[in-house]
Amino acid sequence: MKVTFEELKGAFYRVLRSRNIAEDTADECAEMFARTTESGVYSHGVNRFPRFIQQLDNGDIIPDAKPQRVTSLGAIEQWDAQRAIGNLTAKKMMDRAIELASDHGIGLVALRNANHWMRGGSYGWQAAEKGYIGICWTNSIAVMPPWGAKECRIGTNPLIVAIPSTPITMVDMSMSMFSYGMLEVNRLAGRELPVDGGFDDNGQLTKEPGVIEKNRRILPMGYWKGSGLSIVLDMIATLLSNGSSVAEVTQENSDEYGVSQIFIAIEVDKLIDGATRDAKLQRIMDFITTAERADDNVAIRLPGHEFTKLLDDNRRHGITIDDSVWAKIQAL
């Protein structure tokens, strides 16, 4: 089915207000969920909203909590999220990293005791739109086996790197081949994954999203490389924030909350003039996109460039929502 942005935001707002969330908080949160969905990231927008409400109802998320700065060391700050709403807090933290970068050239905010930030790419994009390089990542509850294991002991720990090119170039990637949200998107659409995304119950690689969702044997991106990167990202976020590691979140909490996150902004214009920056970025993009195609019918992709078209399509033709997901939201 198709809905307008206003209908989608209104549905989110209704549910949030029914939980006695303050009007301004409900409006900003509903706006972020709707913008994420409108941008084509359904897995962490509309599809994720019922799970967000479940955690809100369970008390994992404290909607009126106010993040507090704990430590300030010039370009580096440490904050405690106080388990406030994840996407609103993450937006504020990237804004703060940008403020620090405007003073120091680089700004880093390390956040502890946070909630799921929904679409991590929103915060990298937020920095790049203002002309900054944006880098951020989060740890999570253990939802992926480390390379060589069957049990989930590491997080998918998504990493975002956004570059202020025209259009914005951005990598927004889980340390698994697919996030659990993308497994759900493909299952709901009745599709196999385009490449292997995990292991079946017999330990064989599989493209069946439902099998992987059930047995939780998701495949690390790049096999042992994604596993290793997940581990070091967790270590850095834990140390810089003085917050909880994947192990602590998994063993000490009843669900995924109290995670640790990093937000970095770099003001490129302090290092290079705008015309030179644009020329260098354009040369990189042209060099890549003019390569001989492996398939004449498949364009060479630059990361993040597809979001401009997705956003335009959804604004022109309406936002496609899975019927079953919409029914869940209407029932909340």
UniProtKB/Swiss-Prot annotation:
GO terms for molecular function: 3-dehydro-L-gulonate 2-dehydrogenase activity; NAD+ binding. InterPro entries: Diketo_gul_Rdtase, Mal/L-sulf/L-lact_DH-like_ah, Mal/L-sulf/L-lact_DH-like_NADP, Mal/L-sulfo/L-lacto_DH-like_sf, Malate/L-lactate_DH-like. GO terms for cellular component: cytoplasm. SUPFAM superfamilies: L-sulfolactate dehydrogenase-like. The active site is at H44. It holds the Pfam family Ldh_2. It catalyses: 3-dehydro-L-gulonate + NAD(+) = 2,3-dioxo-L-gulonate + NADH + H(+); 3-dehydro-L-gulonate + NADP(+) = 2,3-dioxo-L-gulonate + NADPH + H(+). It is found in: Cytoplasm. Keywords: Cytoplasm, NAD, Oxidoreductase. NAD(+) binds at I168, T169, M170, V171, D172, M173, S174, W224, K225, G304, H305, E306. It comes from the Bacteria. Its EC number is 1.1.1.130. It is an enzyme of class 1 (oxidoreductase). PANTHER family: 2,3-DIKETO-L-GULONATE REDUCTASE (PTHR11091:SF3), OXIDOREDUCTASE-RELATED (PTHR11091). Homodimer. Belongs to the LDH2/MDH2 oxidoreductase family. DlgD subfamily. Catalyzes the reduction of 2,3-diketo-L-gulonate in the presence of NADH, to form 3-keto-L-gulonate. HAMAP family: Diketo_gul_reduc. This is 2,3-diketo-L-gulonate reductase. It comes from Salmonella typhimurium (strain LT2 / SGSC1412 / ATCC 700720). The gene is dlgD.
